[in-house]
Amino acid sequence: MPASVTPSITGLLLAGGRATRMDGADKGLQLLDGTPLALHVLRRLAGQVDEMVISANRNADRYAELGAPFGARVVPDETLDFAGPLAGLLAGMRAARAPLVVCAPCDTPSLPTDLVARLHAAFDAHRADIAMAVTVDAQHARSPQPTFALLRTSLADDLAAALAAGERKVRAWYARHKTVEVEFRDERAFYNANSWQELAALARR
């Protein structure tokens, strides 16, 4: 294992959303510079972790093909109603072989190559349950990035109970646990493609 890889962490690519602002298209499979968005993310995240898991509720064969070079496994949500990122997070936590999981959405092709190291450093320093990325712009405005986070997989049962009780908001569930915020100054690294317009904007950068 390379020295740059943080030990005992599973990487989780979140690709199980409904993508309503893309007319239901599978975001992770949309092309940026001729390459699926999900593959951009896999290439940047896989080198920072011990193993990769992909949360996907459709096109599992295609995601398995994209993930094969990284040894990634594809897992669906435990529910069939597209319950959002918390459901994908739960699926990944259940599938993880490591005690920690770090998640990232499938439509953020420029995510930081030091994402895991920085989240893990704060996680350890604060003895936290969750470390969440927060971007800070030139005007010092802070924007939480809850789908970029490092979590203990031992929280899976608590998350399952929260989902069963109807919780769908990621930050609301994080607030139940000891969460540390980790500042990132390059907000461009977290740009995503929630719509066709945002995908076109990414292509112009």
From Swiss-Prot:
SUPFAM superfamilies: Nucleotide-diphospho-sugar transferases. Its main location: cytoplasm. Keywords: Cytoplasm, GTP-binding, Magnesium, Metal-binding, Molybdenum cofactor biosynthesis, Nucleotide-binding, Transferase. The keyword Nucleotide-binding applies. It is found in: Cytoplasm. One of its GO terms (cellular component) is cytoplasm. GTP binds at L14, A15, G16, K27, D77, D107. Transmembrane segments: none annotated. Its EC number is 2.7.7.77. GO terms for molecular function: GTP binding; metal ion binding; molybdenum cofactor guanylyltransferase activity. The keyword Transferase applies. It catalyses: Mo-molybdopterin + GTP + H(+) = Mo-molybdopterin guanine dinucleotide + diphosphate. Coiled coil: none annotated. Pfam families: NTP_transf_3. Monomer. Belongs to the MobA family. The N-terminal domain determines nucleotide recognition and specific binding, while the C-terminal domain determines the specific binding to the target protein. Transfers a GMP moiety from GTP to Mo-molybdopterin (Mo-MPT) cofactor (Moco or molybdenum cofactor) to form Mo-molybdopterin guanine dinucleotide (Mo-MGD) cofactor. This is Molybdenum cofactor guanylyltransferase. It comes from Burkholderia vietnamiensis (strain G4 / LMG 22486). The gene is mobA.
